[in-house]
C-alpha cells in the first residue's frame, strides 16, 4: 500500500474516568503523548487522526486503512469492543500498550497485529510491513531506547481540551525496582532523554 494511509489513533477512556467516585478532570490534564509520538513515524502525506476518548466522543462508523489503539488494564474491555467493531467491517487494527504486553494471547484475539513492549522500535517496523502488505501478527520491541524517537506530533493534539497541553516526556520508567510494579519489566529500567532532545521539545512547543 504505497498510497497515503488514512490512520486513526485511539486512546479509549479508562474505566475510572467514567466513575462518579473519581474526578474526571484528572483525565483531561495531559494529552496522549505516547500516541502523538508514534504518529511521528507516519509519512507527511498520511492522514492521521488522534482521538482521546477522555475529552471527545468516539465515532467508530468510519473506515480508515488502519486503527491504532493504546490499551491499559482499565480500558482493555473498551479497547477490545472498539477493535472488534472495526475489524467486523474489514478495518485493520493494531494494538499496543501495557495490557497488550501483559496479556498478549488474550489481546491477539481482538487485533490483527499486537505490539509488545514500548513501540518506538517495533511500530515503525510494523508500519513498513503494513505498507508492503506483509504485516505480522506480533511485533516485540528488540531494544528500549528513547534517544532517536521522532518529534511529538503536537499538530494532532486538540490543545484546548487539556489543562497541560504542552507536557513533555523527559524520562521513562523508574529508577527503583519494586517487585509489585510493572514499570521495571515494561521499560527495563529508567531512561532519561539527553539535554538536546529535551531542549528541542521545549522549543517546538
Q: What does each model-found stretch correspond to?
A:
Residues 26-30, 74, 114, 118, ...:
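Alpha-helix N-cap and loop-to-helix initiation/capping positions
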Residues 3-6, 65, 166:
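Nucleotide donor/acceptor-binding cores
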Residues 3-29:
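Short glycine-rich His-centered loop
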Residues 12-15, 72, 119, 186:
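Flexible loop residues that form catalytic
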Residues 34, 38-148:
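Glycine-rich beta-alpha loop elements in corrinoid/cobalamin-binding modules
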Residues 150-205:
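Radical SAM [4Fe-4S] cluster-binding motif and immediate context
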Residues 2-10, 198-205:
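Conserved SAM/AdoMet-binding glycine-rich loop
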Residues 18, 128-171:
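N-terminal [4Fe-4S]-dependent radical SAM core
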Amino acid at each position: 500500500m504505497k498510497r497515503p494511509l488514512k490512520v486513526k489513533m485511539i486512546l479509549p477512556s479508562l474505566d475510572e474516568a467514567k466513575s462518579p467516585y473519581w474526578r474526571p478532570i484528572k483525565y483531561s490534564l495531559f494529552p496522549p503523548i505516547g500516541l502523538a509520538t508514534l504518529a511521528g513515524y507516519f509519512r507527511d502525506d498520511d492522514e492521521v487522526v488522534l482521538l482521546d476518548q477522555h475529552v471527545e466522543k468516539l465515532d467508530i462508523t468510519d473506515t480508515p486503512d488502519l486503527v491504532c489503539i493504546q490499551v491499559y488494564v482499565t480500558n482493555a474491555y473498551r479497547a477490545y469492543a472498539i477493535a472488534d467493531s472495526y475489524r467486523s467491517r474489514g478495518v485493520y487494527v493494531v494494538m499496543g500498550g501495557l495490557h497488550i504486553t501483559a496479556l498478549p494471547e488474550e489481546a491477539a484475539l481482538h487485533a490483527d497485529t499486537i505490539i509488545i513492549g514500548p513501540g518506538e522500535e517495533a511500530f515503525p517496523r510494523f508500519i513498513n510491513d503494513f505498507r508492503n502488505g506483509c504485516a505480522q501478527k506480533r511485533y516485540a520491541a528488540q531494544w528500549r531506547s528513547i534517544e532517536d524517537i521522532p518529534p511529538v506530533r503536537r499538530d494532532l493534539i486538540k490543545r484546548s481540551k487539556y489543562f497541560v497541553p504542552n507536557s513533555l516526556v523527559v524520562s521513562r520508567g523508574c529508577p527503583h525496582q519494586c517487585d509489585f510494579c510493572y514499570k521495571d519489566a515494561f521499560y527495563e529500567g529508567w531512561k532519561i532523554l539527553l539535554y538536546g532532545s529535551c531542549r528541542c521539545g521545549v522549543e517546538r512547543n
